[in-house]
């Protein structure tokens, strides 16, 4: 029997400069759905450019809690999280408080 696939919290950079966070157990399939316009309503109106980050979680419930936490954060905290993941240079970091969804 195959082990269950981990769930991922992911963050997309959209064409309008905004971020979109979501969860999936198949990141490539979900990103392609966003690109085709068959993903979330938000990404239909604001098409994604790239996946900025993703983090695996053991199950959907844990990934959903992390997604909720991330979506509660202001843009500055999201940028801090991206910098902590090594996806933005240190000078782009707006504050010293890393976001650690769990």
Curated annotation (Swiss-Prot):
Pfam families: GIY-YIG. Disulfide bonds: none annotated. CDD domains: GIY-YIG_UPF0213. Residues 5-80 form the GIY-YIG domain. Belongs to the UPF0213 family. This is UPF0213 protein XCC3072. It comes from Xanthomonas campestris pv. campestris (strain ATCC 33913 / DSM 3586 / NCPPB 528 / LMG 568 / P 25). The lineage of its organism: Bacteria, Pseudomonadati, Pseudomonadota, Gammaproteobacteria, Lysobacterales.
């Amino acid at each position: 029997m195959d082990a269950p696939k981990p769930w991922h919290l992911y963050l997309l950079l959209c064409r309008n400069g905004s971020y979109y966070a979501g969860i999936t157990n198949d990141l490539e399939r979900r990103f392609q759905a966003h690109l085709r316009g068959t993903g979330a309503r938000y990404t239909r109106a604001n098409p994604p450019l790239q996946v900025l980050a993703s983090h695996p979680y053991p199950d959907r419930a844990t990934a959903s809690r992390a997604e909720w936490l991330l979506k509660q954060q202001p843009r500055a905290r999201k940028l801090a999280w991206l910098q902590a993941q090594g996806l933005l240079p240190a000078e782009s970091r707006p504050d010293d408080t890393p976001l650690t969804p769990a």
